[in-house]
Amino acid sequence: MVNVTIYDEAPQLKPNEVPQNMAAGADTQLEHMCRLQFDSPVPHVRLSGIVCTIGPASSSVEMLEKMMATGMNIARMNFSHGSHEYHAATVANVRQAVKNYSAKLGYEHPVAIALDTKGPEIRTGLIGGSGTAEIELKKGEKIKLTTNKEFLEKGSLEIVYVDYENIVNVVKPGNRVFVDDGLISLIVREVGKDSLTCEVENGGSLGSRKGVNLPGVPVDLPAVSEKDKSDLLFGVEQEVDMIFASFIRNAAALTEIRKVLGEKGKNIKIISKIENQQGMHNLDEIIEAGDGIMVARGDLGIEIPAEKVFLAQKAMIARCNKAGKPVICATQMLESMVKKPRPTRAEISDVANAVLDGADCVMLSGETAKGEYPLECVLTMAKTCKEAEAALWHQNLFNDLVRGAGTIDASHAAAIAAVEAATKAKASAIVVITTSGKSAFQVSKYRPRCPIIAVTRFAQTARQAHLYRGLVPLIYKEPGLGDWLKDVDVRVQFGLQVGKKNGFIKTGDSVVVVTGWKQGSGFTNTIRIVTVE
C-alpha cells in the first residue's frame, strides 16, 4: 500500500538513476550493503502501508484528515477498549475525513477500517472490591491464584482470582505465570483443586483486571469469546474492511470467525495475530487459512523469551512473503513518541528493519491512540519506511521469490513478467486493471521497486489493497463501456493521470500495464510497456 502525501517531494535523480543506485546492481549481499549511501536521494513514493490505531488523541475528523495527508492508510479500532457507540462514532469520523480529504485531492482516496478483537484472554479479578485498589507483591512471598468465584472481587495479598477455570489442569509446578504484561512474574509451586500456590519471582504493584500469560502452556480457551462474537457482528454492520483477530492459535479459529461473520461479512479480510507459542507452531496452517498475519510482538514477547521475538518476526514475515500473504509488524515501534516528539535511534532501526525483513505494513498503537504527537509519529514512520525500501536488495529478493513459486497459472506468470519488465525498463510504475484485486496482489508479492497502481471499480477491493506492499489503490467510478478494450484503456489513462498528478509519473517515462483479455476476474494475462505522453 501506498499513497503520495504532502511531504513526498520528487527526488533529484539523473536519467535512469534510482534511489540507492549504486547498491541496486550489487552481486552479493555484502557488496550490496557496502554500497548503501546515507545521502542517497529518497524515493518519491512510500511503498509500505501504515496502520494507525484511533483513540482519544486521533479520533476527530480534523486530526484524521491530517493523518491521511501525512500517510495513514488503515485506521485500526482496538476493541479491548471502548463501547460499540464509541467505535461507531470513530467509523463515522473516518468516513467523513475520507470524504473531506478526497474532495481536496479531486479523486476518491480509499482508507481501510480494521476491527481488532479483544480475543480470548485470562484476567485477574478485582483487588479489594475496587477497580482502582492495588496490592504490592514482593519477591519471595507466596500468593494463591484461585478460580473460586467467591474471590472474584476479594483479591488480597494472600489470594487473587483468575477467570480461567481450567488453569489448574494445564499448569504444572515450576511453570511461570506472568501478570500485567509480564511486569509481575510468579513461579507455580503447588497445584490444588481450584488454586495455584505461587512464589513471587518479580514483584510490583498489582491492580484489578490485569492480563495473565502462561508461557509455554497449551491453553484451551475458546477461539472466539462472546464479546468477540458481538464485536464481529458489529463490524459486519459497520462494513469494516478487515478483522485483526487476536490470539489465533490454529486454523480452526479462523473457521469459527468466518462462521460468525456469515454471508454478509464473507469479503472481510481476516488478519491473524500471532501472540503465543501455539500460534507459532501452527503458523503455516494459519497463513494458508487466513488472509494475512500480524506480528503482535507485545503478548508474543511475554509468551516466548524476549530475545527470541526477532526470530519469530523474521520467520513470520518470510513465510508470508513466500506465500504471497500480507504481513503487518506491530507493537512499540515508536513507543517513546507517546510522550516525546522525537523517537529513539533504536525505534527508527526497528521500523526500518521490519521493512527490510519484508513487512507489508507497520503499525502504530498507543503512539496515535493516546500519544501527544500522533502526526509526528506517522511522518517519522513514513520517512523511515521510504529509506528502508530504497535500501532493500530487490533483485535478490525477486530471484528468491521466483525460485520458490513452483507451478503457476497465467495471471501469476504475468505478475512475475511485469515486475521483471519494470526492473529492466526502469519503469516509473506498474498499472494493473483489476476486479477482485488478485492480479495486483500477485504483482505485489514480487516486490517491484516502483509503485503498483491498482485501478478497480470496487471500493472495498481498493481499501483492502492497503494491506499489500507497493499498491496505490484507485477507485474508478465511471460506468463500464460496451467496448472492453476501450474500457480498459480509459482506466489505464485514469491511473496514469493520478500518477502524473502526484508527480511519480512524468511525460516520457516507461510504465508497465497489466490487463485482462476479457471482462471479469481471473483473466489477467496481458502485459504492455507504454511510454507516457
Swiss-Prot record:
Q: Which Gene3D superfamilies match?
A: Phosphoenolpyruvate-binding domains, PK beta-barrel domain-like, Pyruvate kinase, C-terminal domain
Write out the residues that bind K(+). Answer: N78, S80, D116, T117
Residue sites binding substrate per the record:
R76, G298, D299, T331
The residues the record assigns to binding ATP are: N78, F79, S80, H81, R123, K210
**Record's superkingdom?**
Eukaryota
Annotated site residue numbers, Transition state stabilizer: K273
- Asked if the Swiss-Prot or TrEMBL record annotates the protein with the keyword Calcium, the reply is no
Q: What is this protein called?
A: Pyruvate kinase
Q: Which organism is it from?
A: Drosophila melanogaster
